[in-house]
Every structure is written in C-alpha cells, then in structure tokens.
UniProtKB/Swiss-Prot annotation:
Virulence factor that regulates vesiculogenesis. Acts by regulating the production of mycobacterial membrane vesicles (MV) bearing Toll-like receptor 2 (TLR2) ligands, including the lipoproteins LpqH, a major host TLR2 agonist, and SodC. By restraining the release of most of the material that activates host cells through TLR2, VirR reduces the immunostimulant potential of M.tuberculosis and increases its virulence. May contribute to cell envelope integrity. When overexpressed in M.smegmatis, it modulates the production of IL-10, IL-12 p40 and TNF-alpha by RAW264.7 macrophages and it decreases the killing of M.smegmatis. Changing T61A: Affects glycosylation; when expressed in M.smegmatis. One of its GO terms (biological process) is symbiont-mediated perturbation of host innate immune response. Disruption phenotype: Loss of the gene results in lower growth rates at low densities in rich media. In contrast, Beaulieu et al. show that the mutant grows normally in vitro but is markedly attenuated in the lungs of infected animals. It is attenuated and hyperinflammatory in primary human macrophages. Disruption of the gene causes altered immune responses in macrophages. Infection with the mutant leads to markedly increased release of TNF-alpha, IL-12 p40 and IL-6 from primary mouse macrophages. Its main location: membrane. One of its GO terms (cellular component) is membrane. Changing T60A: Does not affect glycosylation; when expressed in M.smegmatis. This is Vesiculogenesis and immune response regulator. Transmembrane segments: none annotated. Coiled coil: none annotated. It comes from Mycobacterium tuberculosis (strain ATCC 25618 / H37Rv).
Length: 164
C-alpha cells in the first residue's frame, strides 16, 4: 500500500532574503547601468569633442568664404627685463614669472634709470609691442607707458623695469 503525504511539486518558500530571480535581475540591472556609465565616459572624452568641433569649424570656415574674417593675432614682441633697484635677482625673478606666463624674454640684466619709482612696462609704436606690453602689465600688475627717451638706445621690444 502506497501512501502519499504531499505533492512533490510543492515549493517551500525561503523567507531568508530575496528570491534568486530577483537578485539576478538586480545584478543585471546594475551591470547594464555600469556599462552605460563607462560607455558615456569614454564617448565624451575631451579629445573627441575638441576634434569633432575643430573639424566642423574648419569645414564651416572653408565652406563659407563670405563669413566674417577674424583678425589675425598681433605678433608678440620680445620682452627685456631690467633691474633698476638694489634688490639682487629682482629682474631674474620677474623674467621667470613672465616666461612661465608664456612671454619671450630675451634679455635680463641691470639698468640705471633714476626717475622711475615703480615697476613699469615700456613699449614703442612698433606693431605688437602695445598688446604685449598690456599683457605683461596685467601679468605683473604694473603700469604700462610709452618708452622713455632714456630708453631709446635699447633694442626693439617691450622693456620691463623692476624696482624690487
């Protein structure tokens, strides 16, 4: 005689946590989110955006010859830095600052110029000197003026006199 106590197909619920299917679905979802974030990060690298915008800009510029032309940047003048104070190394420190800011410093030395009380940037009317002098003045926080007659024997370029 055969006695059946219960059906073999009955499931006993496991109340210890999430069902296995739910846990697999959550893990798959998190994996997809992670892959999307990686894909977005790789797709939006600064180099790829810069390259594509540069290409489209270049294409637009050549395709539209009637567009407004951009004035070419004025040439940067050479910069000479002279110490007119008794502070040793003042011109060299200033020249290093200007080089770090991207200026072309061609001469560093000492100079005698008695009537200047503060660090000043001097320029002539040669093309590019005024713009360079203004940029140097902003970098150093110094006044910008036309070149003094006492500096007429100096070679062309922007002259920075450092008072210390």
């Amino acid at each position: 005689m055969l006695v059946t106590v219960g059906s073999m197909n009955e499931r006993v619920p496991d109340s210890s946590g999430l069902p296995l299917r739910a846990m697999v679905m959550v893990l798959l979802f998190l994996g997809v989110v992670f892959l999307l974030l990686v894909w977005q990060a790789l797709g939006s690298s600064p180099n790829s955006e810069d390259d594509s915008s540069a290409i489209s800009t270049m294409t637009t510029t050549t395709a539209a010859p009637t567009s407004t032309s951009v004035k070419p940047a004025a040439p940067r003048a050479e910069v000479r830095v002279y110490n007119i104070s008794g502070t040793e190394g003042a011109a060299a420190r200033t020249a290093d600052r200007l080089k770090a800011a991207g200026f072309t410093v061609t001469d560093v030395g000492n100079l005698s110029l008695p009537d200047v009380a503060a660090t000043t940037v001097y320029y002539t009317e040669v093309e590019g000197e005024r713009a360079t002098a203004d940029a140097v003045g902003r970098t150093l926080g110094a006044a910008v003026e036309l070149r003094l007659p006492e500096l007429s024997d100096q070679p062309p370029g922007v002259i920075v006199v450092v008072t210390g």
